[in-house]
Amino acid sequence: MWEEINMIKIYTLGGYEEVGKNMTAVEYNGEVVIVDMGIRLDRVLIHEDVEFQKMSSKDLRKLGAIPDDRPIRNKKVVAIALSHGHLDHIGAVGKLAPHYPDVPIYGTPYTIRLAKSEIKGEEYFEVTNPLYETNYGEIVQVSENLAIEFVQITHSIPQSSIVVIHTPEGAVVYACDYKFDNNHPYGERPDYKRLKELGKEGVKVLIAESTRVAEETKTPSEAVAKMLLEDFFLYEGMEADGLIATTFASHIARLQELIEIANKMGRQAIFIGRSLAKYTGIAKQLGLIKMKGSRVLRSPNAVSKVLKEVSQARENYLLIVTGHQGEPGAILTRMANGELYDIGPRDTVVFSAGVIPNPLNVAQRYALETKLRMKGVRMIKNLHVSGHASKEDHRYLIRMLNPEYIVPAHGEFRMLTHYAELAEEEGYMIGKEVFISRNGHVVEIPGSLEG
């Protein structure tokens, strides 16, 4: 009698009903590799009295702020792999890694150092897991049957990876988050050669983000964002006194562009905000950003002192601040509330970031813009390109890898279904080769047959 063995199980623990709290686990022959441990930030921000670092994983799970990892809690976990350094992928490491004490955590150098920063701030759990910086192209054997590999890809944070879990049944490829940037201003490139090799070697399952798959285009290069910024800041008609730019603190390429623009304008770039200090500090350690001519303000005293100087000679500075989503406590939000700096008609605020599409962010950004408008501030919006793959990026990845099965991830249900529709266009059948899952469910992938 024939029976199916060597089944691969995909535990879809977080990020399969929302954009956030990403966590997936891959089981083969009783051994598990976890990929990502993220948070859902809006579920933390919506409660004013929540102190994330001091809370238990149980309480945060009830808030819907971190993934529910109970389906794999008693499994034999052999490794934790982190795809990149965004908080919706690493923000819960301090809360969830302690459930798997001493299990090694792997990622690229920038990702691991950001994870260490998160762990350092953890106040509820002690984290004993060793963390290892892994280079692109290195294949790490984590058990007799399983190995992991980080393949270079482009996204809106340095050293992002497509994570590959090698099994005797073929590769499980985790592509959350990515885009194909062929003209990155600072030389980052997708490793097309390795992706094509994987396709030839045999990809069993592709787990792919679906955030922007409904957009019928290819996501533009970061070079386009650089051009948009230069086109605004460096044209002859620029008459602004005070210039304030805001973008994602982790978007190191964008921050580098702003430093270079400030230098060309004869202005000093000044970074203000704790998260900007953290991300640029670690990037500088690794040689990922050149801070020439700029300053980073860390202490509240330095911020208030320097902003007094800036207000007397606004034309000499480009302020780069936190707060593009209108987050409470961020620098731009505080300025709009009349704190720190007398922002007004002499100032121009440049938003080099889109609005994250959840109701809390939309509401907070609306409140921020309204306050700035009431103060007479000029606003320039959408000098930005996304870091997420659009439909044609996804189509190319499917064709390169030629996976047997596809599990859409990293999105609300409607996003996952849009990905499934693309897979159908590429010849896959929903329910047979494409599986739409939910948080807490398991997708069972048939293994080889032996008698």
UniProtKB/Swiss-Prot annotation:
PANTHER family assigned: RIBONUCLEASE J
Functional note: A highly processive 5'-3' exoribonuclease; no evidence has been seen for endonuclease activity. Prefers 5'-phosphate or 5'-hydroxyl ends; 5'-triphosphate substrates are very poorly degraded, does not degrade circular RNA. Does not degrade pre-tRNA(Trp) suggesting it is inhibited by strong secondary structures. Also degrades ssNDA but not dsDNA.
Name recorded for this polypeptide: Ribonuclease J
Localization in the cell: Cytoplasm
Gene this protein is translated from: rnj
pH dependence per the UniProt record: Optimum pH is 6-8.
Additional facts recorded: Mutagenesis of His-410 to Val in the T.kodakaraensis homolog (AC Q5JH57) reduces exoribonuclease activity to 1%.
Regulation: Inhibited by 1,10-phenanthroline.
